[in-house]
Amino acid sequence: NPMDCLRYYGDFQNSEYYLVRPCGDLDEDAVDSRISCTQLWVLRKLEPQEFFLHALAYMADHPQMPDGCKVKRERAQAWNGYAVVRGKHPRAKGKLGDILAFAREAVNGPKIEHLSLCVIDGKEHLPDTWYDDNFEECEAA
């Protein structure tokens, strides 16, 4: 789970995140999605938006797995440059430059039916404004 990286390297704005391929002997951790390996191939550095797109894709591919400590339920305010929110009616707000990542669940279960991501740019997406996963302005609820 990419979001587990933020548990260990939580200073998002001053950290770098990479897409890697674990190789050799692999060992999974029973606590979260950590693994250890004897070889690690670094494929490329991820831009901030790419990191959260990978996190959203992981949630969609593994809807029953824990989301990680940085994912909020239903509503979130960005902190440290981002907000990741999951729920039936996810909504979030942030400051200029913040990334908002949304995972909307199906009404009848945890399956993810819609993923979306935006950057608060001050033009199309405004600071301190609540948005739903379709980037429509909404109430905090």
Across the structure, where does each feature detected by a protein language model lie?
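Short, glycine-biased loop/turn motifs at secondary-structure junctions and
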Residues: 2-141
